[in-house]
């Protein structure tokens, strides 16, 4: 008869085996699918037969390399008359407005417009429109989209020139040798690239965001004696880079390989407007509650947080015969440059993300700490040195020394696996490089790309990220139900709907994230 502690150890060991399985699937998917440059897209060669795509880019404030990121939409290898680009802002006082004007001036032959939320008169007349700032920002662009295919990309994302064509190929089912089954929703794997070089100063951050600049934007001055304070004030980008390229990348890849559940982070998503309209129409979709009287399309999610996840989930759960649910476009990476993000800003951003996820995918959020290295190594090492069958058959002693050895062994193996995946995603081996590719997107294996991170620099960021994982999770999930979102504070309900908190109410809310409550300013306090 097993004791209670042995039963708990057995349950944790089983959970650990599930986590190991996911890690193996995810890492294998990364190494296999990001080993070569993707083939040229087929849809780009269709001319007038290519489906029309409306690219929608919601913008809020200045971002590092904003010009490069927005201009990437204009440089796609796709028939120009089959692309419309809509850049969405709240109003023309946003500091990003001149950057968007410059991009449009530089590409006069492309159908591109800046759409201001304050000029959207239909928005105020929409019945039961909610407060979600991102949805309100892009509502008009979605409503007036040309053609059926919509590609929504965050303003701080850069993508290679062939991505549009390959995403259309995946969505439509185009492939060499015949048609494949089309998808309802396709998306990219996102990574973060920190522009900060900790062997030099912060000169790059002070340079103009209008520059399309490559290599000359590398910082040049020595950090000197103030290295530690500057690491704290600018090291959040490296920790965010670590999270997105290790933990997030491998589990994102695993879940999308298994296709067990909708898993899309929302940086770069493509779908059909007609299908989302049907999925959100209570008359056409019997699964919806007609009494709510919500608008259709993206406006349906204007009362919710995590709108990107919910859009993907709506298409996942709505039956469209002949279509697969979600498809990750392997090989193409959505690159997000960051610069000058403090460690506090990183923890605040992760807290916001986790707090939002708590209300949309509660079970996954509760289990998340068990997939983080330090906690995983702790419960697995304890389980391995507690379960009798392992002691009897494998000779693992039930001692604290054995537990410590197991912990360090597991942690080291986990770190090395993360390092391999990190190198693959930052190498640039799958990147289409041309004269317009910015240095941060080239990877360290291409000429003029980012520097390869020294191993000790990787290790320091990895330890920092893993060490912060549980405290940030506990703060976000346990201690609060408000988030700051695009400069406004919102209270989240358990049905994922949100209420904007008036300034006089803010003091009564439980927990706030001060780094997120400042105005938009490049990346240091970026929260979107």
UniProtKB/Swiss-Prot annotation:
UniProt GO cellular component terms: Golgi membrane
Catalytic activity: an N-acylsphing-4-enine + UDP-alpha-D-glucose = a beta-D-glucosyl-(1<->1')-N-acylsphing-4-enine + UDP + H(+)
Main enzyme class: transferase
Keyword set includes Transcription: no
Positions in the Lumenal compartment: 1-6, 391-402, 479-528
Position of sequence motif (Q/R)XXRW: 349-353
EC code: 2.4.1.80
GO BP term (any one): glucosylceramide biosynthetic process
Active-site residues annotated for this sequence: 308 (proton acceptor)
Keyword entries, A-Z: Glycosyltransferase, Golgi apparatus, Lipid metabolism, Membrane, Sphingolipid metabolism, Transferase, Transmembrane, Transmembrane helix
Matches recorded under Pfam families: Glyco_transf_21 (PF13506)
Regions of this protein lying in the Cytoplasmic compartment: 28-369, 424-457
Free-text disruption phenotype from the record: Results in complete loss of glucosylceramides (GluCers) in mutant cells. Shows a significant change in the conidial morphology and displays a dramatic polar growth defect, and its mycelia are resistant to cell wall degrading enzymes. Shows increased resistance to plant defensins MsDef1 and RsAFP2, but not MsDef4.
Sequence motif D1, location on chain: 94
Intervals of motif D2: 154
Subcellular location: Golgi apparatus membrane
Segments traversing the membrane: 7-27, 370-390, 403-423, 458-478
Chain span(s) of sequence motif D3: 308
Membrane topology, record value: Multi-pass membrane protein
Pathway recorded for this protein: Lipid metabolism; sphingolipid metabolism
SUPFAM superfamilies according to UniProt: Nucleotide-diphospho-sugar transferases
Annotated region described as Disordered, given as residue ranges: 503-528
Homology family: Belongs to the glycosyltransferase 2 family.
Function in brief: Catalyzes the final step in the biosynthesis of the membrane lipid glucosylceramide (GluCer), the transfer of glucose to ceramide. Glucosylceramides play important roles in growth, differentiation and pathogenicity. Contribution to fungal pathogenesis is host-dependent.
UniProt domain comment: The D1, D2, D3, (Q/R)XXRW motif is a critical part of the GCS active site, involved in catalysis and UDP-sugar binding.
This protein's name: Ceramide glucosyltransferase
Species, as recorded: Gibberella zeae (strain ATCC MYA-4620 / CBS 123657 / FGSC 9075 / NRRL 31084 / PH-1) (Wheat head blight fungus)
Classification lineage: Eukaryota, Fungi, Dikarya, Ascomycota, Pezizomycotina
Gene (name only): GCS1
């Amino acid at each position: 008869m097993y004791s209670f502690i042995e039963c708990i150890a057995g349950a944790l060991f089983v959970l650990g085996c599930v986590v190991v399985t996911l890690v193996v699937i995810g890492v294998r998917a990364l190494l296999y699918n990001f080993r070569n440059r993707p083939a040229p897209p087929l849809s780009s060669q269709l001319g007038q037969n290519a489906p029309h795509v409306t690219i929608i880019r919601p913008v809020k404030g200045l971002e590092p390399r904003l010009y490069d990121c927005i201009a990437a939409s204009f440089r796609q290898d796709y028939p120009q008359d089959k692309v419309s680009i809509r850049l969405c802002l709240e109003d023309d006082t946003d500091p990003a407005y001149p950057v968007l004007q410059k991009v449009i001036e530089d590409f006069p032959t492309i159908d591109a417009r800046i759409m201001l939320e304050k000029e959207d008169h239909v928005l105020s007349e929409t019945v039961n429109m909610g407060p979600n700032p991102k949805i309100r920002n892009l509502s008009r662009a979605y409503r007036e989209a040309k053609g059926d295919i919509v590609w929504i990309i965050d303003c701080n994302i850069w993508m290679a020139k062939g991505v549009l064509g390959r995403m259309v190929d995946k969505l439509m089912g185009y492939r060499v040798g015949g048609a494949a089954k089309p998808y309802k929703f396709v998306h990219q794997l996102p990574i973060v690239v920190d522009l900060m070089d900790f062997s030099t100063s912060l000169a790059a951050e002070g340079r103009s965001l209008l520059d399309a600049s490559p290599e000359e934007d590398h910082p040049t001055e020595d950090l000197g004696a103030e290295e530690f304070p500057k690491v704290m004030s600018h090291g959040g980008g490296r920790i965010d880079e670590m999270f997105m390229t290790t933990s997030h990348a491998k589990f994102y890849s695993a879940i999308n390989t298994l296709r067990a559940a909708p898993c899309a982070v929302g940086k770069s998503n493509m779908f059909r407007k007609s299908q989302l309209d049907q999925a959100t129409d209570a008359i056409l979709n019997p699964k919806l509650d007609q009494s709510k009287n919500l608008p259709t399309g993206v406006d349906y999610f204007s009362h919710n947080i995590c709108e990107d996840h919910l859009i993907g989930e709506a298409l996942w759960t709505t039956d469209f015969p002949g279509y697969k649910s979600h498809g990750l476009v392997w090989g193409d990476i959505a690159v997000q440059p960051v610069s000058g993000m403090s460690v506090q800003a990183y923890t605040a951003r992760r807290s916001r993300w986790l707090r939002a996820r708590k209300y949309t995918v509660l079970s996954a959020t509760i289990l998340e700490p068990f997939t983080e290295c330090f906690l995983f190594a702790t419960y697995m090492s304890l389980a391995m040195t507690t379960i009798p069958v392992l002691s009897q058959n494998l000779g693992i002693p039930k001692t604290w020394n054995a537990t410590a050895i197991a912990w360090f062994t597991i942690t080291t193996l986990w770190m090395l696996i993360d390092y391999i995946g990190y190198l693959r995603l930052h190498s640039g081996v799958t990147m289409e490089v041309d004269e317009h590719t910015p240095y941060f997107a080239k990877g360290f294996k291409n000429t003029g790309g980012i520097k390869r991170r020294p191993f000790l620099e990787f290790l320091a960021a990895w330890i920092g990220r893993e060490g912060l994982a549980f405290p940030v999770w506990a703060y976000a999930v346990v201690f609060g139900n408000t988030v700051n979102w695009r400069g406004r504070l919102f209270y989240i309900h358990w049905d994922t709907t949100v209420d904007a908190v008036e300034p006089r109410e803010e003091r009564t809310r439980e927990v706030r994230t001060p780094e997120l409550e400042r105005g938009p300013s490049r990346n240091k306090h970026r929260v979107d």
